[in-house]
């Protein structure tokens, strides 16, 4: 699949920019009713094409060991037409501000254009069906998971990645403003 090279590149970008650390975060794309997803407990900065897990839309494993957040990905794909990629990170500022009960405001033209509106989900245990169900109820393309991280969805992987970058930048700006 041609998109796997881009998939790996995006995973490495996320790791290099510290949007994910350790084995946190995960990425997936949907193609022809198959989900290509990062493996469980993987370091995104070091994965290669052979590591990518593949599942069908019912969660049946075709190849590899998918992320423990698989059901969050599956639920989003099932409920959101037009979503073909998901990026879930534990980006520092995007995670920290909501922990301190600070709102992340869309302060720049770029953030208003690309993010439009931010969704929020209360804290649910990571890897839980409750979290998967709550996230999939949201219709925003950027969703803050309280005390956990963010989920960005897009029509393709570059779109979801762009939203991740813009979200972290606007979160950094919000942090600076809250600090003044």
From Swiss-Prot:
<dbReference type="InterPro" id="IPR050197">
    <property type="entry name" value="Aldolase_class_II_sugar_metab"/>
</dbReference>
<feature type="binding site">
    <location>
        <begin position="67"/>
        <end position="68"/>
    </location>
    <ligand>
        <name>substrate</name>
    </ligand>
</feature>
<dbReference type="GO" id="GO:0005829">
    <property type="term" value="C:cytosol"/>
</dbReference>
<dbReference type="GO" id="GO:0019323">
    <property type="term" value="P:pentose catabolic process"/>
</dbReference>
<comment type="similarity">
    <text>Belongs to the aldolase class II family. AraD/FucA subfamily.</text>
</comment>
<dbReference type="Pfam" id="PF00596">
    <property type="entry name" value="Aldolase_II"/>
</dbReference>
<dbReference type="InterPro" id="IPR036409">
    <property type="entry name" value="Aldolase_II/adducin_N_sf"/>
</dbReference>
<keyword id="KW-0862">Zinc</keyword>
<keyword id="KW-0456">Lyase</keyword>
<comment type="function">
    <text>Involved in the biosynthesis of the coenzyme F420 which requires phospholactate produced via the aldol cleavage of L-fuculose 1-phosphate and the NAD(+)-dependent oxidation of (S)-lactaldehyde. Catalyzes the reversible cleavage of L-fuculose 1-phosphate (Fuc1P) to yield dihydroxyacetone phosphate (DHAP) and S-lactaldehyde.</text>
</comment>
<feature type="binding site">
    <location>
        <position position="90"/>
    </location>
    <ligand>
        <name>Zn(2+)</name>
    </ligand>
</feature>
<feature type="binding site">
    <location>
        <position position="148"/>
    </location>
    <ligand>
        <name>Zn(2+)</name>
    </ligand>
</feature>
<dbReference type="InterPro" id="IPR001303">
    <property type="entry name" value="Aldolase_II/adducin_N"/>
</dbReference>
<comment type="subunit">
    <text>Homotetramer.</text>
</comment>
<dbReference type="GO" id="GO:0008738">
    <property type="term" value="F:L-fuculose-phosphate aldolase activity"/>
</dbReference>
<protein>
    <recommendedName>
        <fullName>L-fuculose phosphate aldolase</fullName>
        <ecNumber>4.1.2.17</ecNumber>
    </recommendedName>
</protein>
<feature type="active site" description="Proton donor/acceptor">
    <location>
        <position position="69"/>
    </location>
</feature>
<feature type="binding site">
    <location>
        <position position="69"/>
    </location>
    <ligand>
        <name>Zn(2+)</name>
    </ligand>
</feature>
<feature type="binding site">
    <location>
        <begin position="25"/>
        <end position="26"/>
    </location>
    <ligand>
        <name>substrate</name>
    </ligand>
</feature>
<keyword id="KW-0479">Metal-binding</keyword>
<dbReference type="InterPro" id="IPR053406">
    <property type="entry name" value="Fuculose-P_aldolase"/>
</dbReference>
<feature type="binding site">
    <location>
        <position position="88"/>
    </location>
    <ligand>
        <name>Zn(2+)</name>
    </ligand>
</feature>
<dbReference type="GO" id="GO:0008270">
    <property type="term" value="F:zinc ion binding"/>
</dbReference>
<feature type="binding site">
    <location>
        <begin position="40"/>
        <end position="41"/>
    </location>
    <ligand>
        <name>substrate</name>
    </ligand>
</feature>
<comment type="pathway">
    <text>Cofactor biosynthesis; coenzyme F420 biosynthesis.</text>
</comment>
